Design a protein with these regions (language model features):
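Conserved helicase ATPase motor motifs in RecA-like P-loop NTPase domains
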Residues: 27-32, 105-106, 120-147
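Conserved strand-helix element at the start of the C-terminal RecA-like helicase core
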Residues: 30, 35, 53-63, 184-211
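The feature captures the C-terminal accessory region of ATP-dependent helicases
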Residues: 41-42, 309-486
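Inter-Walker segment of RecA-like/P-loop motor cores
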Residues: 55-97, 227-234
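SF2 helicase catalytic motif II
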Residues: 92-127
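Interdomain hinge/linker at the junction between the two RecA-like core domains of SF2 helicases
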Residues: 139-185
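Conserved helicase ATPase core of P-loop NTP-dependent helicases/translocases
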Residues: 216-247
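Conserved SF2 helicase motif VI
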Residues: 267-292
Length: 486
């Protein structure tokens, strides 16, 4: 159990003193002392020898956590990968004796939404005459590539298999059952807390529309979200409220040490992100247990992810097959490199020359995702998911029994608005409900589009357009919508 588990310092022992001009992998699950080894053993050893140290983090939350823990360490340069990329774009080329690449899955995992991961990647990979330590609990694919490409030798791999001995049960569910699951938990107990990872801002908004102020909500600071509370975690607990909904912004750097946190639900699609999300809880003792809930995507949803992934890859593969022909076609279409880079996440433009370039980290991530999604298309999402999660969690899988049926938010809205006259302002509000709750993002949201969505969702309602014929009315001769029962 928890009291007898190994820590990474037990595996490395004093071997770190023999690391010379090499690259090292430290791979182990959360709670195995990776960070403590770096801060309490490795960094002091280098600092006492007068060496220069760079510590890289992938999230601001992790940066803040590390900064608090290394207050007594003078001489360490602490940066996020994103800050390093900004410095490199300015031409900065500082050198260090030791580089800690913490949460190094960043190079692949963030590559889909950060166009400059290549800069940090090339900088770290290009380090010479020093030691680079790659640290992560979930960078399996990245570590495999490091070994396959000869970057890291097998003698410099230190790992501890991930343990989920604190997990009591594992469940799977489909999207429509999320609120049912949560409502069932809330009804069964009056203290157990729930952490939910949603896959989009639209889903976060939908949950806020349903649960309102009874829950906390977290998202990236770059998102304009009036109801998000980014300081809702105090002393590694979320206080006062029993629910926290978050996007993948909380995938690491935030540890939750709270024996009331008994349920972690994830709707994320990317399995590497899922592994990060379920690692947020740090059990206190063997009595501190938790259940996991994984959303299962059907074949149609998996195919949608595949189409989206392929759309990005195909353009880049045409470019790589014949660069000259590709660039000539750009000229013919009167397009420049920056326009292409804005449309395609794998391309970026060199900040000095403006030349079109391929982000190799992003390309690798898209290629890996293609292989994974093709596997899902053939064998099913759930099969591939549990293959990655491992047999320990698979063996804890149980059937989900739900007695509480949650209300349908949108159906309640339709019932409330039934037979009411909806003029221009009310129509605008209704369209916002279609967007926020049903995820409708068509450019033109006319009455036919809205009725099509109602039909797709099998709601027994339709919207009709009418004209006010009451001469005494202030809205005489104006058109309005009305929601009618079919």
């Amino acid at each position: 159990m928890l009291g007898s588990k190994k820590y990474i310092s037990d595996i490395i022992k004093d071997e770190y003193k023999e690391w010379k001009n090499t690259k090292v992998i430290v791979s182990s699950g959360t709670g195995t002392g990776k960070t403590q080894f770096m801060l309490k053993i490795l960094l002091p050893y280098y600092l006492q020898a007068g060496k220069r140290v760079l510590y890289l983090c992938n999230r601001k939350a992790l940066y803040d956590q590390i900064r608090k823990e290394m207050l007594s360490l003078i001489g360490v340069t602490l940066m996020t990968y994103q800050s390093l990329q900004k410095e490199l774009r300015k031409g900065s080329t500082n050198t260090y004796d030791l580089v800690i690449a913490d949460e190094c899955h960043y190079f692949y995992l963030d590559a889909k939404f950060n166009g400059y991961t290549d800069l940090a990647y090339e900088y770290v990979m290009g380090q010479q005459a020093n030691v680079v330590v790659f640290v992560s609990a979930t960078a399996d694919s990245f570590f495999e590539d490091l070994v396959k490409d000869g970057v890291v030798k097998k003698d410099y791999i230190y790992s501890i298999p991930k343990s989920y001995d604190y997990v009591e049960k594992v469940y799977t569910y489909h999207k429509s059952r999320l609120t049912d699951i949560i409502d069932e938990i809330l009804a069964d107990t009056d203290f157990e807390k729930i952490l939910v990872f949603v896959n989009s801002m639209e889903r976060l908004i939908e949950m806020h529309n349903y649960y309102g102020d009874s829950a906390y909500y977290m998202c990236s600071q770059s998102q304009a979200c009036s109801f998000a509370t980014r300081d809702c975690i105090e002393n590694k607990k979320f206080l006062n409220k029993r629910m926290l909904f978050t996007t993948k912004v909380m995938d690491n750097g935030v540890d939750l040490i709270d024996d009331d946190l008994r349920h972690i639900i994830t709707e994320l699609f990317d399995i590497d992100s899922i592994l990060q999300s379920i690692g947020r809880k740090r059990p206190i003792d063997y009595l501190d247990t938790c259940s996991f809930y994984f959303k299962v995507y059907d074949g149609r949803a998996v195919n949608n992810f595949y189409v989206s992934n392929q759309k990005q890859l195909e353009l880049v593969e045409r470019y790589m097959a014949n660069k000259d022909k590709f660039l000539q076609n750009l000229d013919v279409q009167n397009l420049d490199a920056r326009q292409i880079a804005r449309k395609n996440k794998i391309f970026y433009t060199d900040f000095r020359t403006g030349i079109l370039k391929v982000n190799q980290c992003t390309l690798k991530k898209y290629q890996m995702d293609r292989n994974t999604i093709e596997d899902m298309k053939q064998n099913g999402y759930e099969t591939v998911l549990f293959r990655r999660l491992g047999t320990e969690l698979l063996n804890k899988k149980s059937e989900l029994r739900i007695e509480t049926e949650s209300k349908d938010i949108f159906l309640s809205i339709l019932k409330e608005l039934e037979r009411k006259k909806l003029f221009k302002e009310e129509q605008k509000e209704l369209k916002e409900k279609f967007r926020d709750i049903l995820g409708l993002h068509d450019r033109t949201m006319g009455i036919n589009t809205l009725n099509g969505k109602l039909q797709d969702r099998q709601y027994p309602y339709k919207i009709v357009s009418c004209k006010d014929r009451l001469r005494q009315s202030e809205t005489y001769n104006k058109r309005y919508w009305m929601i009618q029962k079919i």
